[in-house]
Protein backbone atom coordinates (compact mmCIF):
# COMPACT_ATOMS: atom_id res chain seq x y z
CA UNK A 1 0.00 0.00 0.00
CA UNK A 2 2.51 2.62 1.11
CA UNK A 3 5.10 2.14 -1.62
CA UNK A 4 2.49 2.08 -4.36
CA UNK A 5 0.87 5.26 -3.00
CA UNK A 6 4.17 7.10 -3.30
CA UNK A 7 4.53 6.05 -6.93
CA UNK A 8 0.93 7.08 -7.65
CA UNK A 9 1.32 10.56 -6.21
CA UNK A 10 4.86 10.89 -7.58
CA UNK A 11 3.89 10.40 -11.22
CA UNK A 12 1.07 12.91 -10.83
CA UNK A 13 3.60 15.48 -9.62
CA UNK A 14 6.03 14.61 -12.43
CA UNK A 15 3.22 15.14 -14.95
CA UNK A 16 2.32 18.47 -13.31
CA UNK A 17 5.88 19.69 -13.66
CA UNK A 18 6.69 18.31 -17.13
CA UNK A 19 3.29 18.09 -18.88
CA UNK A 20 4.70 14.98 -20.59
CA UNK A 21 1.68 12.75 -21.36
CA UNK A 22 3.64 9.55 -20.71
CA UNK A 23 3.70 10.44 -16.99
CA UNK A 24 -0.03 11.13 -16.96
CA UNK A 25 -0.64 7.79 -18.65
CA UNK A 26 1.60 5.99 -16.18
CA UNK A 27 -0.03 7.75 -13.21
CA UNK A 28 -3.40 6.47 -14.43
CA UNK A 29 -2.13 2.91 -14.85
CA UNK A 30 -0.60 2.82 -11.37
CA UNK A 31 -3.72 4.43 -9.91
CA UNK A 32 -6.06 1.94 -11.57
CA UNK A 33 -4.11 -1.00 -10.12
CA UNK A 34 -4.06 0.69 -6.72
CA UNK A 35 -7.81 1.38 -6.70
CA UNK A 36 -8.60 -2.18 -7.81
CA UNK A 37 -6.71 -3.56 -4.81
CA UNK A 38 -8.39 -1.45 -2.12
CA UNK A 39 -10.67 -3.00 0.48
CA UNK A 40 -14.32 -2.01 0.69
CA UNK A 41 -13.75 1.08 2.87
CA UNK A 42 -11.02 2.31 0.46
CA UNK A 43 -8.33 2.62 3.15
CA UNK A 44 -5.35 0.52 2.03
CA UNK A 45 -3.59 -2.25 3.86
CA UNK A 46 -0.02 -1.44 4.81
CA UNK A 47 1.02 -3.83 2.02
CA UNK A 48 -1.29 -5.20 -0.66
CA UNK A 49 0.65 -8.48 -0.67
CA UNK A 50 0.48 -9.13 3.08
CA UNK A 51 -0.60 -12.77 3.46
CA UNK A 52 -2.71 -11.90 6.52
CA UNK A 53 -5.20 -9.77 4.52
CA UNK A 54 -7.98 -9.07 5.51
CA UNK A 55 -6.46 -8.97 9.01
CA UNK A 56 -3.39 -6.95 7.99
CA UNK A 57 -3.01 -3.44 9.43
CA UNK A 58 -4.49 -0.56 7.48
CA UNK A 59 -2.43 2.46 6.53
CA UNK A 60 -4.44 5.67 6.87
CA UNK A 61 -1.34 7.69 5.95
CA UNK A 62 -1.15 6.00 2.54
CA UNK A 63 -4.87 6.58 2.08
CA UNK A 64 -4.47 10.28 2.84
CA UNK A 65 -1.53 10.66 0.43
CA UNK A 66 -3.42 8.91 -2.36
CA UNK A 67 -6.67 10.82 -1.75
CA UNK A 68 -4.78 14.08 -2.17
CA UNK A 69 -3.00 12.83 -5.30
CA UNK A 70 -6.25 11.53 -6.79
CA UNK A 71 -7.85 14.94 -6.48
CA UNK A 72 -4.95 16.52 -8.35
CA UNK A 73 -4.89 13.75 -10.95
CA UNK A 74 -8.62 14.19 -11.55
CA UNK A 75 -8.04 17.75 -12.74
CA UNK A 76 -5.69 16.66 -15.54
CA UNK A 77 -8.14 14.27 -17.19
CA UNK A 78 -11.40 14.42 -19.14
CA UNK A 79 -14.50 14.54 -16.95
CA UNK A 80 -15.38 10.82 -17.11
CA UNK A 81 -11.97 9.57 -16.06
CA UNK A 82 -11.29 12.52 -13.80
CA UNK A 83 -14.61 12.03 -12.03
CA UNK A 84 -13.74 8.40 -11.27
CA UNK A 85 -10.57 9.48 -9.47
CA UNK A 86 -12.30 12.35 -7.68
CA UNK A 87 -15.07 10.00 -6.53
CA UNK A 88 -12.48 7.50 -5.26
CA UNK A 89 -10.76 10.28 -3.30
CA UNK A 90 -14.09 11.28 -1.77
CA UNK A 91 -14.74 7.67 -0.74
CA UNK A 92 -11.30 7.50 0.89
CA UNK A 93 -11.81 10.80 2.70
CA UNK A 94 -15.25 9.69 3.87
CA UNK A 95 -13.72 6.59 5.45
CA UNK A 96 -10.79 8.52 6.89
CA UNK A 97 -13.28 10.99 8.40
CA UNK A 98 -15.30 8.22 10.06
CA UNK A 99 -15.09 7.20 13.70
CA UNK A 100 -13.06 4.15 12.63
CA UNK A 101 -10.10 6.32 11.61
CA UNK A 102 -10.51 9.55 13.61
CA UNK A 103 -8.78 9.88 16.98
CA UNK A 104 -11.36 12.25 18.45
CA UNK A 105 -10.13 13.34 21.85
CA UNK A 106 -7.92 10.29 22.42
CA UNK A 107 -4.76 11.65 20.75
CA UNK A 108 -3.36 14.99 19.58
CA UNK A 109 -3.86 13.98 15.95
CA UNK A 110 -6.64 13.48 13.45
CA UNK A 111 -5.96 10.04 12.02
CA UNK A 112 -5.47 6.67 13.64
CA UNK A 113 -4.24 3.44 12.04
CA UNK A 114 -1.16 4.39 10.03
CA UNK A 115 1.91 2.27 9.46
CA UNK A 116 5.34 3.88 9.43
CA UNK A 117 7.78 1.01 8.84
CA UNK A 118 6.42 -2.50 9.26
CA UNK A 119 9.69 -4.42 8.64
CA UNK A 120 11.34 -2.44 11.45
CA UNK A 121 8.23 -2.75 13.67
CA UNK A 122 8.09 1.04 13.88
CA UNK A 123 4.88 3.06 14.06
CA UNK A 124 2.46 0.17 13.58
CA UNK A 125 -1.22 1.12 13.93
CA UNK A 126 -0.12 4.59 14.98
CA UNK A 127 -0.96 8.23 14.49
CA UNK A 128 1.68 9.81 12.24
CA UNK A 129 2.06 13.54 11.63
CA UNK A 130 2.42 13.27 7.86
CA UNK A 131 -0.85 11.32 7.72
CA UNK A 132 -2.57 14.35 9.22
CA UNK A 133 -0.73 16.66 6.81
CA UNK A 134 -1.92 14.81 3.70
CA UNK A 135 -5.40 14.34 5.16
CA UNK A 136 -5.75 18.11 5.65
CA UNK A 137 -4.21 18.74 2.22
CA UNK A 138 -6.75 16.39 0.62
CA UNK A 139 -9.67 18.01 2.46
CA UNK A 140 -8.49 21.47 1.35
CA UNK A 141 -8.05 20.29 -2.23
CA UNK A 142 -11.56 18.85 -2.24
CA UNK A 143 -12.96 22.09 -0.84
CA UNK A 144 -11.15 24.09 -3.52
CA UNK A 145 -12.54 21.84 -6.26
CA UNK A 146 -16.05 22.08 -4.85
CA UNK A 147 -15.71 25.88 -4.87
CA UNK A 148 -14.62 25.87 -8.51
CA UNK A 149 -10.89 26.42 -8.00
CA UNK A 150 -7.92 24.24 -8.88
CA UNK A 151 -6.35 21.96 -6.30
CA UNK A 152 -3.13 23.92 -6.14
CA UNK A 153 -3.39 27.09 -4.12
What are these regions (language model features)?
Residues 1-6:
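Short, small-residue-biased leader/transition segments that mark boundaries at the very start
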Residues 55-153:
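CBM-like carbohydrate-recognition segments
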Residues 7-13:
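Membrane-embedded hairpin module used as a gating/binding unit in multi-pass transport
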Residues 13, 45, 114-118:
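Generic signal for short, ordered secondary-structure residues
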Residues 15-85:
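A beta-strand-loop signature enriched in Asp, Gly, Thr, and Trp
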